[in-house]
Amino acid sequence: MGSWTKRPPPETLARIREIISANADGAIEAHDLRTRHAGRMMFIDFHLVVPSSMSVAAAHQICDRLELAIKAEFPDALISIHVEPDDQAKHSGRKVHGEEKDAAVAGLEVPTP
């Protein structure tokens, strides 16, 4: 299927997970990480669960922080973050704060057909 379906190496995925974990303070959970390459561009998207009481502005600040951190290491990345309020989210159980933070994104990647 050409370069659109090319997955990044496992160490790249691990690094993206680490960046998300280190920069998602204020969020509850991250899940459904998907990555693909098309030429030099890497497309990264994932879902970020935030407290339902969080303002749009606060959620946007978290997303900005995540995008800047990811782009610092992957400047050719196009990043899409789908924000979900926790009372409507499809929870994965992968928390991104407290003691569970490191494990939160360990299984973030979801294979895509």
Question: Residue ranges of each PLM-predicted region?
Answer:
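Alpha-helical transmembrane segments and adjacent TM-loop junctions that form the membrane-embedded core
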Residues: M1-P113
